[in-house]
């Protein structure tokens, strides 16, 4: 089993959208669980609206004791949707100790960089879990300067 956490302290960074899209794609060949640990329960909200047609399961739970048992569940991949703040540090700390990989979605905006860097420095690096930053909300009409 692989546990992949989608995290960024900035709200609106695209965490839930990333989780739900990845779950849909991965579910084509694997048993997928989305674990919504965000108190706003955005992934659970999406799942409720989709009804019975989702090709993956969704559970919302912020209890650290339950999160530490994710590997006992019968899934190939667990995708974890996290809160857009660092208020639930105990939940984030628990889930990162269980995670194999962290994806940090962010938009290419100066206002997005400070929360991203804070998330990496304060939460991800201390956990020693492998991570990558994923740029989203990119407008292909805007030229990118590589330097």
Name these PLM-found stretches.
Residues 3-9, 13, 20-94:
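P-loop/Walker-type NTP enzyme "switch/lid" segment
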Residues 28, 83-147:
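Conserved catalytic-core segment of NTP-binding enzymes
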